[in-house]
A protein has these predicted regions:
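Acidic, low-complexity cytosolic segments
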Residues: 1-23, 33-149
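Short, acidic, Ser/Thr-enriched surface-loop or helix-capping motifs
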Residues: 28
Length: 149
């Protein structure tokens, strides 16, 4: 594991510890996983890969809709609530936030979690990620994905 990837995973882990989020990951806008929090087992990694692909598809469709309204705007964030409100323990939310043009932060958490806290901590994590990447822009992890800035 590269040093940068390890630092990214630490940021994702801290997001979970600070918020009660069940999963946090960095993904590309093509649906590829860059980094996932370290508390994942093999089954969770497969679920995250599927969520990453689905999130990329949702993002792409939403961006097309935004382009129809105003072609000069870029989608910044999507929040998806899932569940029937019959069993709040199983209802969940997916929050997808753009970090760079091709890198997204995907967070999955119980619907009953404080969304304001999630937004606050996610924004802190995004700032940390951007600072890390600026410090180590030559790292292969991001160079393979393309230009970030």
């Amino acid at each position: 594991m590269s040093e940068l990837r390890g630092k990214l995973i630490k940021i994702l882990d801290d997001l979970i510890v600070n918020t009660g989020v069940t999963s946090s990951s960095l993904i590309t806008d093509d649906g590829l996983v860059i980094a996932i929090n370290s508390q994942q087992n093999e089954e969770d990694e497969e679920v995250n890969a599927n969520f990453a692909a689905i999130s990329a598809s949702i993002l792409s469709m939403a961006e097309r809709g935004i382009e129809i309204v105003n072609e000069n705007k870029m989608l910044e964030q999507i929040k998806i609530d899932a569940g029937l409100n019959q069993n709040l323990d199983e209802d969940f939310t997916i929050l997808i936030t753009r970090i760079y043009s091709n890198v997204l932060l995907q967070v999955i958490f119980p619907k009953k979690t404080n969304v304001g806290l999630i937004h606050f901590e996610a924004n802190k994590a995004i700032k940390l990620i951007k600072n890390l990447v600026k410090q180590d822009i030559s790292e292969d992890l991001f160079n393979e994905i393309g230009s970030l800035l």
